[in-house]
Amino acid sequence: MKHFAAAALAALLALPGTASAQLAGEPFIHDPSTIMESDGKYYTFGTRGGGLVSEDGWTWHSGGERPGGGLAPDVIKIGDRYYVAYAVGGGGMNGGHASNIKMMWTKSLDPKSRDFGFHDVGVVASTDGVENADAIDPAFLLVDGRLWLSYGTYYGFIRIVELDPKTGTRLAGNQPVDIAIDMEATALMHRDGWYYLLGTHGTCCDGPNSSYNIRVGRSKSLTGPYLDNMGVPLLKGGGKLVIDGRGREFGPGHFGLIDLGGGMEKFSMHYEADMDRSGRSVLAIQPLLWRDGWPLAGENLKAGTYEIKSERSGNALQLNVDFTRIPFDVRKSFFAPAGAPIVSLPDQTLAEDQATWPKDKVAVDLGEYMIRPHQQWTITPVPNAGGYFGSPYYKIVVAGTDRALAATRDDEVVTAPSFTGAPEQLWRIDQLTDGSYRITPKVKSASRRDVALVAIGASTPTLATFDPANDSGRWTFKAP
C-alpha cells in the first residue's frame, strides 16, 4: 500500500492543476512505492531497484538506492525506521510464480546520510509456484498499532498477513487470508470505520496497449469480505472504478495514498504509457476525492480562464472597481411591443470594463457573477518557477491582461499591474476531498504562517489560516 502521513508533507501543501498531468524532470518509473519524505527530500522506489527523488515534490529525477532488486516495492515509516518490502521471483518472470516477499529497514533513505544503511529482516510471505497465489506487489497498512501486508497478482488470490510493527517480521502463527481475485498491485486504506482494498485491474507492461485501471472495494473488517458499490465481492472479481486512462496517458496502476490533512488527499501511481514521453511508464500524482463513502480520482486543474467562486457565499472573486453598465434601454425589456425582433446582446468588452480601472495596484473583493471581464481569471503554470507536491506554481491574471493576483506581507490580496514572477504572485491550487479547491500563495506571510485565500463574509477576500471545518477557504473554478 502507499500511504503518506500528513506531518511528513506539511510543508508541501499541494496544488492540482496543470495544463498537463505530467510531473517535471524525468519521472520514469514502474510500480512506484509509497512516496516518503526523508532528510528533506521525497523518495519513491520501483521495480528492479533504485527509484526517484525530488526536493519539492514536483520535479523528479533518478536517485535513491534500494538494494535487492526485485519487483514492486513498498515503503512505510514506523518510528525512526523506514521498512521496505519487495518481491523476488514470481510475477510470471521466467515462467514461474514461486516468489518471496522480503523485508529490510533503514533509518534514512538519503544515501548521503550517516543513518543510511539497509538491514535485512528476511522473508515475510512466500508462494511455492504451485498454490493459487503469487507473492509479489506487497503493500503496507498500519492501523491502530497493527501492521498489515497485502500482496498478490492476477495469478490467484490477493492475500493479507499481519507483521510485527516493531521488527517487520511476520507474526508467529499468522496465516494468510484470501481477500480478492482478478487484481494486482493492491493498496489498503482505513477511513471512517471502513477498510478499503484498492487493486489494479486490466493488462500491464505493453505501453499504450496496457489497460491498467484502479478499482476498489470496502469492508468493515480488514480481512474482508470486501464488496464493491454494487455489492459484488472482490473475491468474485468486483471493484468500483477509481481511475482509468486520461488524455494521452494510459494504464494507471499502483495506487499510493498521500494524506496531507486538512481535507486534502492525493495519490501517487504510474501510468503505463505517457504518449508525450515516448510511451514510457511515468510517476503521476492526482487529487483524491470522496463521494458517498467511496474514493475516486479528482482532476488536476487545467490551464484556462475561469470564474473563481467562493463556496462560502457563491460570489465571485473580482477586481474592486467601479461597475460599468452595459448600454441598455430598460423600456425594451418591459414595454417591447408584440413581435419585436429578438437580437443577441454582445458581452461587455475588456476595453469597456477596463476604462475606469486604476493603473496601479487594485484591490479585490467578491460579488455576484455577471460575466464581466474583471470577474474572469486566466490561470497558467509558470515555466521554470518550480513547484510543490504534484504540481507547478501558477499565475492568476485578469483575463486578457497581465494584471496579476498577488499576496501582501500583511496577509491581504491585491492585483499588481503586471506579472513579474515574484513569489507573492505564484499560487498553489489544491483540490480538496469534496472537489472544491484551496488557493495558497507561495510566499510566507510576515507571521511565517501558511495562509490561504479565505472569504470573510460575503464580499471580502483575505489571507488567513485554512480551516477545513467550514467553507470560507473553499473555491470552485467554472468556465465563463
Kindly label every feature range from the protein language model.
Residues 1-4:
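Positively charged n-region of N-terminal signal peptides that target proteins for export
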Residues 20-329, 373-384, 423-428, 433-436, ...:
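Carbohydrate-active catalytic/glycan-binding domains of CAZyme proteins
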Residues 6-7, 71:
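Residue-level detector of transmembrane insertion/anchoring sites
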